[in-house]
Amino acid sequence: MSKKYPIISVVGSSGAGTSTVKNTFEQIFRREGVKSVSIEGDAFHRFNRADMKAELERRYAAGDATFSHFSYEANELKELERVFREYGETGRGRTRTYVHDDAEAARTGVAPGNFTQWAPFEDNSDLLFYEGLHGCVVNDEVNLVRHADLKLGVAPVINLEWIQKIHRDRAQRGYTTEAVTDVILRRMYAYVHCIVPQFSETDINFQRVPVVDTSNPFIARWIPTPDESLIVIRFKNPRGIDCPYLTSMIAGSWMSRANSIVVPGNKQDLAMQLILTPLIERMVREARRARA
């Protein structure tokens, strides 16, 4: 953690909805005049697309059917921790971009499935924003939690997460349902051992819960809408969080536990704005004072 150069880490698996959360943060940053630098988690994958395919084939031939992008060893977590540490100490660091498709290739000049060159962060930033799979990993080799000042988890109930991933990968990446299902199965071991434990380290978790039948996500024709969902928001330490105020400001919300509130799915953005804006404002104010 760093008073001068704070770090916000948002963790969620593929299809969890972290991009929506990132958009809300960008709105807050813009409104509050916060200059941020950002890291996308896939920038720290260890392999490009071709090399990952070869590594998957090698491991499968050796009897390992669990290796995936969720796995620790498929990612440069020591390098990610080094960047977190450097930013917290100096406000400097570096990142790159993983190019997913032709549109990104046209913008970056790099073929899909490859990385851009490493590039330094812009100077004079207020904070670092990370969004990806591994921003709160604690294991025998790295401890990313100790570097992050605000840690958020985005964890829909599992069937909803699968529905969102299937629909996203079919629409944006041209995969078949069967291909996405194979990916889900291969990732399950690392999901349980590498992704899920991070949600015990986060300060706030946002869990979307559908109120329609999602019992077979592999045949679902559409993603449950916000109006067909609830959001459970859990605070690791509710001290300083005025839950009665939040429930009074958000129509249809209530406290389900002393550290949890439930809001209608179409109020997620409002809830995040109300919860996160004062936290970010205080974090940035104290950081600017410490740097002065």
From Swiss-Prot:
InterPro entries the UniProt entry points to: P-loop_NTPase, PRK, PRK/URK
Binding-site list for ATP: G12, S13, S14, G15, A16, G17, T18, S19, T20
Pfam family, one: PRK
Gene: prkB
Organism of origin: Cereibacter sphaeroides
Protein name: Phosphoribulokinase 2
Protein family according to the UniProt entry: Belongs to the phosphoribulokinase family.
Reactions that this protein is recorded to catalyse: D-ribulose 5-phosphate + ATP = D-ribulose 1,5-bisphosphate + ADP + H(+)
SUPFAM superfamilies in the record: P-loop containing nucleoside triphosphate hydrolases (SSF52540)
Keyword terms, alphabetized: ATP-binding, Calvin cycle, Kinase, Nucleotide-binding, Photosynthesis, Transferase
GO MF annotation terms: ATP binding; phosphoribulokinase activity
EC numbers for this chain: 2.7.1.19
Pathway: Carbohydrate biosynthesis; Calvin cycle
BP GO annotations: reductive pentose-phosphate cycle
Enzyme's top EC category: transferase
